[in-house]
Amino acid sequence: MDRDNEVPLPKPKWIYRTGIGQDSHRFLPESSTKPCILGGIIFDHCPGFQANSDGDIIFHAICNAISSVTNKIILGKVADELLQTRGITDSGIYLEEALKSLKPNQKISHVAITIEGSRPKFLCKLSALRQNIAQVMNLTPTDIGITATSGEGLSDFGCGDGVQCFCVLTVMEYCD
């Protein structure tokens, strides 16, 4: 093709950014009364996590994915400040703070989550997780994809010592 005859591409109206986040926590002893909270949902018959907060690894992984787009650190900075000054341990509040860090011209369009752990059992609550995460993030449940694996005993998570979560999200950014 002759470079002199090339037509310049129009400036795109939308650019897409990808965020990635991870979090993991070890379970407390079985005798603990702290609830096991994942994606804002309580999972019965499983102890809570060793964490200063409620230990919600799904919300934490989403926060970290948003931070990778906005460069505003929520966990370890904003969350610690909320804990120390106001005693807030609810990871849903941390996620709300992460969402506020998005620019007005940015919108999350898709969230993909994968969880590894032999317990609790996730399959029966996948729909409730999608619904709750979508509600907190002002998305539709079809914008949330969740997969879970037991790990089959190959890692500490697969052996039942804790749970690990990865999140990849797509952010659409409008450009003038």
From Swiss-Prot:
A single GO molecular function term of this UniProt record: metal ion binding
Free-text comment on the cofactor: Binds 1 divalent metal cation per subunit.
CDD domains in UniProt: MECDP_synthase (cd00554)
Protein keywords: Isoprene biosynthesis, Lyase, Metal-binding
Pathway: Isoprenoid biosynthesis; isopentenyl diphosphate biosynthesis via DXP pathway; isopentenyl diphosphate from 1-deoxy-D-xylulose 5-phosphate: step 4/6
Enzyme Commission designation: 4.6.1.12
Catalytic activity, reaction form: 4-CDP-2-C-methyl-D-erythritol 2-phosphate = 2-C-methyl-D-erythritol 2,4-cyclic diphosphate + CMP
Taxonomic superkingdom: Bacteria
Residues the record lists as binding a divalent metal cation: D23, H25, H60
Chain sites annotated for binding 4-CDP-2-C-methyl-D-erythritol 2-phosphate: D23, S24, H25, T149, S150, G151, E152
Residues at the site labelled Transition state stabilizer: N52, S150
A GO BP entry: isopentenyl diphosphate biosynthetic process, methylerythritol 4-phosphate pathway
UniProt-listed InterPro entries: MECDP_synthase, MECDP_synthase_CS, MECDP_synthase_sf
Keyword Transport among UniProt keywords: no
Metal-binding in keyword set: yes
Signal peptide limits: none
Assembly information from the UniProt record: Homotrimer.
Family assignment from sequence similarity: Belongs to the IspF family.
Entry function: Involved in the biosynthesis of isopentenyl diphosphate (IPP) and dimethylallyl diphosphate (DMAPP), two major building blocks of isoprenoid compounds. Catalyzes the conversion of 4-diphosphocytidyl-2-C-methyl-D-erythritol 2-phosphate (CDP-ME2P) to 2-C-methyl-D-erythritol 2,4-cyclodiphosphate (ME-CPP) with a corresponding release of cytidine 5-monophosphate (CMP).
PANTHER family per the UniProt record, alphabetical: 2-C-METHYL-D-ERYTHRITOL 2,4-CYCLODIPHOSPHATE SYNTHASE, CHLOROPLASTIC (PTHR43181:SF1)
Matching HAMAP family: IspF (MF_00107)
Name of the protein in question: 2-C-methyl-D-erythritol 2,4-cyclodiphosphate synthase
Naturally occurring in which organism (per UniProt): Chlamydia pneumoniae (Chlamydophila pneumoniae)
